[in-house]
Every structure is written in C-alpha cells, then in structure tokens.
Amino acid sequence: MANAFGGGTGGPESDSSTIRSFFMFLERLSSATGLLGGLVALLVLGSAGAAADVTLTHVHGLAWSADGARLFIPSHHGLAVYENGKWSKAPGPAHDYMGFSATRARFYSSGHPAPGSGLVNPFGLIRSDDGGRTWKKLGLEGESDFHLLATGFATDAVYVFNHAPNSRMQSAGLHYTLNDGLMWKKATGRGIEGEPTSLAVHPEDPKVVAVGTRDGLFLSTDAGDTFRRLAAGQTLAAFFDLDGTHLWSAGHEGKPTLHRIDWKGGSAREVALPPLTEDAVAYVAQNPARRDEYAIATFKRSAFLSRDGGKTWAPIARQGQGVDRREGPQASKP
C-alpha cells in the first residue's frame, strides 16, 4: 500500500461508474495541482464594506471571524465576506489565497500575491491578526504554495502537505509547525492509503490530525506519525468540531454525504444535506460564537448555513451566485 505522504500514488478508483463520473466532474473543477481542495473560481465584488453581487468560482476555504459575525470565503481575488445576510468584499488585499484556515484569533493561508503588490510569489505561509486586512510573512515565500493547510483553533498548530522539498522541509509530505513556521517537523504518515484530498487539525490537541483521501478518512493521535482508518470510502472534506469530540466528514457514495463522527467512540451520525445535483460538500465551518451554526460550501460553488446543528440549511450562494437574504428563520430544508 502506498503511503500518501511518502510520494506514493493513490489507490484504485471505485468500480462504480457513478463515482468515476463524479471524480471526473471534480477533476474538471480542481486546480492545476489536481487537489480537490480548490473550487474553480472568480469573485465579482463591489468595493470593500459595500453590498455587492458576488459570483463564487475558486473557493479555497471557509471560516468565521472570531466574534462569529462574518463568514469568509477566500479565492483568487481576495476574501468575500457574508455578514448580516449580505455579501461584500472584505477589507484587505486581493491576494489569491490558498489553504485558508482560521484559528481563534488569526487567519493562516498560502497562495499568491495580488498583481502589482510587489510581494514574492508564492507566499509560503502567511498570517493575519486583523481579519485579513494585513498579512505577516512566516517563511517559505518564493518556495511553496500549500493547497492543503489546516490549523488548530485554540493552539495555532499548522499542518501542511507539501509536494516538493523546500528550504525547511527536506522531503515532500505532511509537516507541521507549533511556532508559526520557525521550526517544521516531518510527520511519517504511516497507515495513510490514497492521495490526500483534505486535512483537519483538532481544535485543542495539536497531536490529533485527520487526513481524507479517496480511500477513506484516517486519524492520527501522535502528530501524524501513525494513522488508523476511521471511515471507509472517499473523503472530500474533513473538519474537527470545536467541541473536540466530533469530526465532520463529507464524501460521495452514489450521492453526496456528510457525517458527524465521534472520533474516539467511532459512532457516526449522517447529517441531512440540502438537495445537491452532481455535487458534494467541499468545506465545513463552525461559528465559534454560536456553535449550533455551521456553513458548508460545495464543489459546484453553492453555500448553505445551518443554525440548528445541521438539521436544516438555508442557501447563501447557489452555483456560484451569492444570495443576499434577510437574517431570521431558515427558509430551506433538506
């Protein structure tokens, strides 16, 4: 069995024609690297702080502000923000953010600078302490662009999957830092099967990390050195609930699926999804201020909010088009 973090190839595709067709669809939407973590995209936005028509086309993450008031979607042309039922452009540079992830008080990202910014391309690892208005370089600029990047909400632990060696990582694979990139450690990744498609870090324990592949969802409790299979089947998105007990996993097995898994006990609950046609969940996020509120974004560029723990979902974007809506009771059910 190939180790996905040691340069091995992914496992065989499913015999199901439905799954093969779906992966062909995903591959058409994926970025040039072939990772499924990027949604092909364009953002058409008004001026910062003003209501605007928004068309979503590369969505490279999904995260709330620390106060829970704003939902951010990063892309090739800066950050789009959903606040009080309205879409707008978030203040800050129009960088091409990749691997965007949030902690309690910070944003972390990789990607490419906006044209004319004069910054080195690619970013390596960058950090924002002010909601994306300004960014600090944390190293590896001009060397690495991390499409798979995840952070620990309360710890600021950063895990990345790099495709090639760089000045701080002697080999490709899974690496992590606990001090904002001053020192990186290599994770062995034993037990992983298949090509990585998603990455998640426990909110409080930096040693607990999950990796999704086409062959399953894999969990490590020793900082990525060894993994055990937590769930079978392709995993397109992974996200640790802020309660630290549950892990969200999205896939497609004849239909789009979303599960909330007790990663210690192993029990799983299927979460009902809104109607999705030839689509699946690509990102999951939880509001840190109102923890029954979740957001999902899909590969076909739709986005939904739930304020009841995933029982019902209200659309805030449909197939790339932002939907401005009045705040209040949710209007759509699965």
Where are these regions (language model features)?
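Beta-strand-rich domains and repeat architectures in extracellular enzymes and scaffolds
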Residues: 53-80, 99
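Repeated scaffold domains used in trafficking and secretory/extracellular systems
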Residues: 59-60, 95-101, 144-151, 194-200, ...
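Residue-level detector of Asp-centered blade-edge/turn motifs that repeat once per structural unit
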Residues: 65-67, 102-104, 151-155, 203-205, ...
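Short loop/turn segments immediately following the C-termini of beta-strands
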Residues: 76, 112-114, 163-165, 214, ...
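Asp-box/BNR beta-propeller loop motif
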Residues: 77-94, 122-139, 173-188, 218-230, ...
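Blade-loop segments of beta-propeller domains
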Residues: 90-116, 120-123
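Short, solvent-exposed loop/turn segments at conserved positions within beta-propeller repeat blades
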Residues: 116-122, 165-172, 252-256
